[in-house]
């Protein structure tokens, strides 16, 4: 009978049972349930005509209803995309790329000669910890938590840049202060490359574009 068959299956030693099942609660829209018939939804064709897919992917990921119901709200979408995805992540990448391209460049990456990672062991440890946390969260299918850890890397990078202020030294003559500041910019460049990989599950299109830039520079380096 069925109960006997089920018991036999359960007793099999070679049968691997699921022990990490991903499940979410409900995602609401502006306080109500999604409904195609009531035209209460986010229509992807219309959305993609005006906006980038990665911004929606980011908001859905950071607002994922993993442990309780969450609400898709357009005002929160605008706020989180502007302040987090653009203001934290995008701003960091833009600052690093802009500053790096202001350096005089012969052949290869102009930041290579400023690689002094031994001077930044504390920052590297912080970044490694964030990556480890993100990996652990992903393995446990806690994607919102993983994304927060990755965004923490961008925050570390922004703090590093702000403290080093490399824009003050780019056009200055070579000195210890200049080398120290530009070593922070060089590390920030590497952090951007790391972010391009870590963010790919959440923002694949912009990550691919960023990876192409870094792949090109690595080939020249």
Question: Which role does the model predict for each range below?
Answer:
Residues 1-6, 10, 214-221:
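Single conserved hydrophobic/aromatic residue that forms the stacking wall/gate
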Residues 11, 57-64, 190-197:
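Short, hydrophobic/amphipathic alpha-helical patches that form generic packing surfaces
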Residues 19-23:
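Beta-strand segments within the central parallel beta-sheet cores of soluble alpha/beta enzyme folds
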Residues 26-116:
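Catalytic adenosine-cofactor/nucleotide-binding cores of aminoacyl-tRNA synthetases and other
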Residues 36, 47-48, 77-88, 119-127, ...:
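Secondary-structure capping and boundary motifs in well-ordered enzyme cores
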Residues 69-74, 129-136:
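Short, charged/polar, low-complexity loop and linker segments
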Residues 93-134, 154, 158-175:
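Conserved, charged catalytic cores of large soluble enzymes
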Residues 136, 140-142, 151-216, 221:
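Basic, alpha-helical terminal appendages of large translation-related enzymes
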